[in-house]
Amino acid sequence: MPNPSSTSSPYPLPEEIRNLLADVETFVADILKGENLSKKAKEKRESLIKKIKDVKSIYLQEFRDKGDAEDGEEYDDPFAGPPDTISLASERYDKDDEATSDGAQFPPIAAQDLPFVLKAGYLEKRRKDHSFLGFEWQKRWCALSKTVFYYYGSDKDKQQKGEFAIDGYSVRMNNALRKDGKKDCCFEISAPDKRIYQFTAASPKDAEEWVQQLKFVLQDMESDIIPEDYDERGELYDDVDHPLPISNLPTSSQPIDDEIYEELPEEEEDSAPVKVVEQRKMGQDSVHHTSGDKSTDYANFYQGLWDCTGAFSDELSFKRGDVIYILSKEYNRYGWWVGEMKGAIGLVPKAYIMEMYDI
C-alpha cells in the first residue's frame, strides 16, 4: 500500500466526503475535547485522527488552495504531531483568526477585567477560515466594551482571541447565514473594505438585543446629538458620554399654566431654564433618604464613572471612583438624581455614576 503522505490525488475531494470529514472532525476535536475517555475510546479517537491526517495528506494541495482562495490566511493544522499531542493540536485549532481587519491592535485584557461592558454573552462566531476541515461556527464569549467588540474562548479567559473597534461599522440581522433552526438568530457587523463579522445568538430575541445595543452605540458615535432611547413610559434615557446640561432640560411633559410665570419677551430664551431650576430647587427642599438605614442601604451607594464638575451651585462635583449616596431619584426623567458626598448634597448626573455593590 502506498504511503499516503507521498500520494497526491488528481481528483477533487467530493463534497459529501468533505462534509463527512468535517462532522468527524467536529466530534473528535471539539465534542470529545476535555472528556474523560476510557482507554478504548482514546485509542479510537487517535485512530480517527490518524485517518483524517492521511486524507489531508492526499488532498493537501487542494486543501491549501481552498484556504488561500477563500481567506488569504494561513491555516493551522489541528492534527499536526503524534497522537500523544492531541490536546495541544486541538488547542491550536481553537486559536481564532485574531488579527483585526484594519490593522489596529489592542492590548491583551482578561474577560473579567473589561471596563464598561454594555453587552456580553456567548455567541457562535463564524470563522474567517471555514473551509474544508474547518469549524464554520465556534462558540465564543463576546463583549461590547465601550466601542470595542471583544471575543474570548470563555468568560474566564485571561486574553482575548480577537477584537475590533466598531467605529464605521453597521449591524443588521441576517437570516441567510444558516439554513438550520438558528437562521433567525444570526446577525452580522460589516463595513466597506473591512472584514465582515457574523454571529449566531442563542435565540432571536438575544440576537435582536445585540443588534439594538450595537446600533445605539454606533448612533452615538456618529453624532454629537444624544440618541433618544425610550423606555416603556416614553421617557428619555441620557447618553453616557453626553449628559444633558441643565439649560437644555425639558421643563415638563405637562403644559405649564401661563399664569404662574410672568412673560418677559426680552428674556424669552432663558425663561424655560429658570423654571426648571426653580422646580429642582423646590424639590430639593424636601429631599428624603431612599432608605431608612444608610449603613445597610447598599443599593443606593454609587461611585463615579468619570470626573464631573458641576455647572451650578446645586450640582455635586466628584471624581472617578468617589462614593456617592443617592438620596432621591426625583429627577430621574431628566437624567439627574440627588446625592450626598462627604456631607455635601447636590444634583448628580446619573449617566456619570454606577452601582457600587452588585446586589
Swiss-Prot record:
This is Src kinase-associated phosphoprotein 2. One of its GO terms (cellular component) is cytoplasm. The SH3 domain interacts with FYB1 and PTK2B. It comes from Pongo abelii (Sumatran orangutan). Residues 67-88 are annotated as: Disordered. GO terms for biological process: B cell activation. The modification Phosphoserine is found at residues 5-6, 9, 87, 90, 223, 286. The gene is SKAP2. The modification Phosphotyrosine is found at residues 75, 151, 197, 261. Interacts with FYB1, which is required for SKAP2 protein stability. Interacts with PTPNS1. Part of a complex consisting of SKAP2, FYB1 and PTPNS1. Part of a complex consisting of SKAP2, FYB1 and LILRB3. Interacts with LAT, GRB2, PTK2B, and PRAM1. May interact with actin. May interact with FYN, HCK and LYN. Interacts with FASLG. It is found in: Cytoplasm. Belongs to the SKAP family. PANTHER family: SRC KINASE-ASSOCIATED PHOSPHOPROTEIN 2, SRC-ASSOCIATED ADAPTOR PROTEIN.
